[in-house]
Amino acid sequence: MSWEVVIGLETHVQLNTRSKIFSGSSTAFGAEPNTQANVVDVALPGVLPVLNKEAVQCAIRFGLAVNAEIAPRSVFARKNYFYPDLPKGYQISQYELPVVGKGALTIQVGDTEKTIRITRAHLEEDAGKSMHGASPGQSGIDLNRAGTPLLEIVTEPDMRSAAEAVAYARKLHELVQWINICDGNMQEGSFRCDVNVSVRRKGQEKLGTRREIKNLNSFRFMQQAIEFETRWQIETLEDGGKIEQATVLFNPDTGETRAMRTKEEANDYRYFPDPDLLPLAISTEDIDAVRVTLPELPSAMKARFERDYGLSAYDASALTASRSVADYFTATLAEFGGEAKLVANWVMGGISAKLNEEGREITDAPVSPVLLAGLLKRIADNTISSKIAKDVFEAMWAGEGDADAIIERKGLKQVTDSGAIEAIVDEVLAANAAMVEEFRAGKEKAFNALVGQTMKASKGKANPAQVNEILKRKLAG
């Protein structure tokens, strides 16, 4: 009997707030150690936490985006454990009554759509950071990160492969950036995933013993970690061994997971309501105030692009993969006013290729939506051919001006005069008699070669449609 892997994710999303969740300290990344930690963050006696309203609004935005229940009353709890980077000796989190309840996120793996159930999302504070190696034989603590607001998003164990888990993580990563609650910077720790993996015999309902892979900050590492952990658990069970519940780390150098500690249960943390914080009350008016600030969501925008612009599902998905790409496409289309498919082809083609080549984000592209729209207008009105447009685009990317200026300066206007094109065709046919005979003998490739020769003779300026029409007429004569 074969095995089935069962996967659930817990994702820590660092919220885009200017200050920490319970203090006024800055959340800016990269400051000198302990320069962004005030008396609340270092847990001096007598200080009290004050909840950051902006963090609550971020949680509500997320809940609305995944069609989740927003709790009218939620409670902050103390999660008690000792660690050097946790100065209070407890973390303020939520346990029995989280701010966001059941929701869902739909993913796509290949041609298959699947809905992943979201169990809950709760607010909590981040811990500090242990620093090793700065001084021989000593470790330090940086409390800049202590108190940074997090939204922990927990799924049901609905995923059945590494591919599904990565698809969910990518979709969630895209969503939290889209609704502007997280910058999504995985290298800086803004988006960290813990993956719970267990295996069971196919057809068995009871879940196997899970092991939690902690702090994965790369989709590639997530894929590798899940695949290794799955193989390890299956091999262990088939060899007669037993899986112990544990927290494990993934080593990207070896591609292996290793147990770090026995996995704690909720009872180990002795949760109880934080007496320093009142229950969080959220009214319908509070939710509605956040709802009006929510942008059109990726799924709705994708459907609109397919419905209103006639784009394929593939094109619509690619254009809504990130908010910045969708905004660029929309702005270009509005300025261009022409066929959406032409805009989509250039955004996914020329623009995307240059961005990948140079490692840029689309927000840093030297060709703005206005500039790209100017180029597309000249393609649409046959001022230039699609081939010449690529040369104009390269010049625009290099900062040589807008499309009209480059076309004028370099003399790139397309030749549309039928008489001029006919003269070029006559010269090409006269110079390539053998190719003409091949075409008349039934070799279709010869026609394409003659088109190529004509375009070459015109230095790429002849209108391709006219070249085709004139060639066909003359060869048929």
From Swiss-Prot:
Reactions this protein catalyses: L-glutamyl-tRNA(Gln) + L-glutamine + ATP + H2O = L-glutaminyl-tRNA(Gln) + L-glutamate + ADP + phosphate + H(+); L-aspartyl-tRNA(Asn) + L-glutamine + ATP + H2O = L-asparaginyl-tRNA(Asn) + L-glutamate + ADP + phosphate + 2 H(+)
InterPro entries found in the cross-reference section: Asn/Gln-tRNA_amidoTrfase_suB/E, Asn/Gln-tRNA_Trfase_suB/E_cat, Asn/Gln_amidotransferase, Asn/Gln_tRNA_amidoTrase-B-like, GatB, GatB_C_1, GatB_Yqey_C_2, Gln-tRNA_amidoTrfase_suB_CS
rRNA-binding as UniProt keyword: no
GO process annotations (BP): glutaminyl-tRNAGln biosynthesis via transamidation; translation
The protein's Enzyme Commission number: 6.3.5.-
GO molecular function: asparaginyl-tRNA synthase (glutamine-hydrolyzing) activity; ATP binding; glutaminyl-tRNA synthase (glutamine-hydrolyzing) activity
Keywords associated with the record: ATP-binding, Ligase, Nucleotide-binding, Protein biosynthesis
One Pfam family, short name: GatB_N
Keyword Oxidoreductase among record annotations: no
Function: Allows the formation of correctly charged Asn-tRNA(Asn) or Gln-tRNA(Gln) through the transamidation of misacylated Asp-tRNA(Asn) or Glu-tRNA(Gln) in organisms which lack either or both of asparaginyl-tRNA or glutaminyl-tRNA synthetases. The reaction takes place in the presence of glutamine and ATP through an activated phospho-Asp-tRNA(Asn) or phospho-Glu-tRNA(Gln).
Subunit text: Heterotrimer of A, B and C subunits.
PANTHER family: GLUTAMYL-TRNA GLN AMIDOTRANSFERASE SUBUNIT B MITOCHONDRIAL AND PROKARYOTIC PET112-RELATED (PTHR11659), GLUTAMYL-TRNA(GLN) AMIDOTRANSFERASE SUBUNIT B, MITOCHONDRIAL (PTHR11659:SF0)
Family: Belongs to the GatB/GatE family. GatB subfamily.
Designated name of the protein: Aspartyl/glutamyl-tRNA(Asn/Gln) amidotransferase subunit B
Organism: Methylobacillus flagellatus (strain ATCC 51484 / DSM 6875 / VKM B-1610 / KT)
